[in-house]
Swiss-Prot record:
One annotated GO biological process: tRNA modification
Keyword RNA-binding carried by entry: no
Record's protein name: tRNA dimethylallyltransferase
Site residues (Interaction with substrate tRNA), renumbered to this chain: S99, R128
Gene3D superfamilies per the UniProt record, alphabetical: 1.10.20.140, P-loop containing nucleotide triphosphate hydrolases
Keywords noted in UniProt: ATP-binding, Magnesium, Nucleotide-binding, Transferase, tRNA processing
UniProt xrefs under HAMAP family: IPP_trans
Cofactor(s) listed: Mg(2+)
The protein's assembly and partners: Monomer.
Segments of this protein annotated with the region Interaction with substrate tRNA: 36-39
A GO MF label: ATP binding
Reactions this protein catalyses: adenosine(37) in tRNA + dimethylallyl diphosphate = N(6)-dimethylallyladenosine(37) in tRNA + diphosphate
Keyword Transferase in record: yes
Amino acid sequence: MKNNIVIITGITASGKSELCDNLIEKYGNISIINCDSKQVYEEIPIITAQPPKQEVFYKLYGYVSAKENYSVGLWLEDLEKEVNHALENAQIPIITGGSGLYISSLIKGLSSMPQISQKVRKNVSELRKNLSKEEFYKLALSKDPRIQGKVFMNDSHRLSRALEVITETGKSIFVWQENRQPPLFNNFKIYTILPKREDVYRKINSRFITMIENGAIDEVKKLLSMNLAPHLPAMKAHGVPEIIKYLKGEITLDEAIQIAQTNTRHYAKRQYTWFKKQFLNAEVIDCANKLKIF
């Protein structure tokens, strides 16, 4: 196999996990390595749809404490070890997940991003909380005009990040992103799964209901009991902020479910746009069942 590292990416709820299960069952000599920024956290396996811990084929899932502000740089270090271990043991590494920053850093190299002070992070977080979406977007755009057409109003996470960087350094986040380290590997084949939107949206809705039934609320209760800072990544996993509002009595459970489903669908919509513009050498398929790797 010329490209002995496989990357399977795509939008949320596109069937990546089911595909990996099938590949393990069919071939066996593979190592599934996580490329999802929230599935690394140990305390939230249900709401991030992690595979069972006893599955020895799966690597880099549920092994980081939610107390940690885990970064793409740390993930690349862990990834390199797992890929090399797989290759040394005659296994094919299959890197899978939908976190765009992780995948982009793997393929194109890691950007030399600046450290953001707690003061700036807190100030931006307060602005994000107190301003409307439109006001927050206009503020970010006034500080960094380069975000126009690249970061959109509903993408509050990327807007916050852009505002943090320009506030901390005086330089656009895109200036920092242009300064990249060499990529870890270049011998890979990438597949992007982009199913029909209505199928994805339907699965997002049903999957969140299943997560609630399987104990997601208790999972978030335990997360709350840890008294974590709200800016930590685990606290921003899809469904966590909405369930926290429910547990605090701010909204009903039905409202929490509906809002979480809506927010995740919006995230999937943004992923569609992003993945279509990225990785032009990827093989794009509309259904995980159509993917043929070997």
